Every structure is written in C-alpha cells, then in structure tokens.
C-alpha cells in the first residue's frame, strides 16, 4: 500500500455533517495512492454489547457522506477500511484478525461489492495466520516483547515521545521557577 496522505488534524479527524447528528472523531485517517480510505481506531474497552460493530456502521456512513459530494455517482464511492485495533477479543473466538464484508445470506460466496471492509485486530488472539509484522504489532499492543524491525521502531518512537514529554515537563518546571523568580525580583 502506497500512502498518499495521512491526516492528523488535532490528533483526530472530525466529521460533523449536520447540526442535529452525532459528530465522529477518527483516530487516524489515511488515503493511499489509489484513493482508498483507511480509518484506524484504537480500542481498549469493549463498551456495551454490540456497540463497536454498530460504531463501524456509523463511521462508514459518515466517511461515505464526507467523501460523496452532491451530484457525484455512487460508483465513485471509494474503497474504505475501518480498522479497530483492540486490546481484547471482541468476538471471543481467539482469532487475531476478524474481517467483515457484506455477503448474501443465501449465497455466502456472493459478496455485495460495496467497497466497505471492517477489520477488528485482536491483540489477545492466537488463531489465524498473519504476517510477522502484524503478529509483532499485536504483541506490541498487548504489552509483550516483539522482535520485528517494525515493532522495534515503534518501541523507539514511544520512548522518544516519552522523553519529549519528560523534557517538556522539565522545561515547564524551569520556566515556572524562572517566572516565580522574575516576579520576586531575583
């Protein structure tokens, strides 16, 4: 996947289409070179029964409405992936990855082809084949030691951000002390 653009407006992308509807704040919103949209969400709590699957439905609707201008044909809707990275097994089946697309109940091999895919990654899962980087990423999310280059880069980035936050706190403490001394005329 070649990424064209990653949006981090104020950490989350907001979609607020109507005054009388609920707004959506997306954790990470990515568009690749083919125009495919990826919405990636981190989930540490299950919420009420059925909440997360229904939230993917709502996010899908809001993303589609945001992408589809008035007068544009429906076949211009882009492929979208809504990905929930979960620190728990939402479905209780011990799979590492659960991928959902709309299928015909009477003919399960018949896919609707609406371009919408929902993926739930399970950091606790042990079943199902995934590539090494994804396996290590899920271990990383679960707080386990991961060996891949990607996981090591993520760990280094987390440490860098932690150091940056510590430096920011130290700077603010020094600055506040300076302000206090300045006011006291020292």
Where are these regions (language model features)?
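Elongated, amphipathic alpha-helical interaction scaffolds
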Residues: 1-184
